[in-house]
Regions:
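Conserved nucleotide-cofactor-binding alpha/beta core module
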Residues: 112-236
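Short hydrophobic targeting helices and cationic amphipathic motifs
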Residues: 19, 23, 30-31
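Class I SAM-dependent transferase core
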Residues: 35-120, 128-132, 136, 150-161, ...
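Substrate-binding/catalytic lobe of Class I Rossmann-like enzymes that use SAM or dcSAM, i.e.
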Residues: 222-256
């Protein structure tokens, strides 16, 4: 049962599944990347974080600190590292993307994460968002991913970045949630669904919050904040405006 729907601001900058970046494949490109050391990459990353804060996208010191602790270049393949500071999605395996930094920041600010919260992420992707979540809750994060290639990609990235024992990557259908670790204070979904999956509502604590894009299969959804009001799964929905994510595939999402 839905109590009410509130419309919030429209998010103008949305996710794009095919980022318009001119990726060079020549020898000079690889030579350039190899000559860049981590300090160069981190300086670029710091400038992006400062820009997101200046634009009012990063609002809290906690989210800013997490972004500075977990730079995106640690979660992309070598050929994309020099683009990690660009505020656009980047390709990752299985035809998916790592989200644009502004979109990740928007969702983390809306999540209002606190130390000790129990959080499930649906759509592990590269592992970057899960690492950010860990820095905001300081408790093991559970993230579920249906694409086996991405499960391995996320696990390797997380291990290299020092999060092997801090994030548990599960291979499975995220639209079913992960009952063994429920109930959750927060569930964050990083793909677009046709509707809010009922199992995710059921696995929230009363007062818990679910963030999920809901709408069409490609290119247009609305970012919904779903708050569970009671044990009968009565919910309140806030609409945070237009976004565009890859489709959420599963029994309670889109069919392949």
């Amino acid at each position: 049962m839905v109590e009410q729907v509130e419309t919030w601001k429209f998010i103008e900058d949305t996710e794009r599944t095919n980022p318009p970046i001119n990726l060079k494949s020549s020898f000079t490109h690889f030579l350039f990347v190899s000559l860049m050391d981590e300090s160069d990459l981190y300086r670029r990353w710091m400038r992006l974080v400062e820009n997101l804060e200046r634009e009012g996208i990063i609002k809290s010191e906690r989210v800013k600190r997490a972004f500075l602790q977990v730079p995106r270049y640690k979660f992309v393949s070598d050929r994309y590292k020099e683009y990690a500071h660009v505020d656009e999605p980047l390709p990752i395996p299985a035809g998916q993307t790592i989200s644009a930094p502004h979109m990740v920041a928007i969702m983390l600010e809306l999540a209002e994460l606190e130390d000790g919260m129990n959080v499930l992420e649906v759509g592990a992707g590269s592992g970057w968002n899960a690492a950010l979540i860990y820095e905001l809750i300081k408790r093991k994060v559970y993230t579920i991913e249906r694409a086996s290639d991405l499960v391995e990609f996320a696990r390797k990235n997380l291990e290299r970045a020092g999060y092997k024992d801090k994030v548990h990557v599960i291979w499975g259908d995220g639209t079913k949630g992960f009952p063994p670790n429920a109930p959750y204070d927060r569930i964050i979904v990083t793909a677009g669904a046709p509707k809010v999956p009922q199992p995710l509502i059921e696995q929230l604590k009363v007062g818990g919050k679910l963030l999920i894009p809901v709408g069409s299969y490609h290119l247009w959804q609305e970012l919904l904040e779903v708050i569970k009001l009671d044990e009968d799964n009565k919910i309140k929905i806030k609409n945070h405006g237009g976004v565009a994510f890859v489709p959420l595939i599963g029994d309670h999402g889109w069919r392949e």
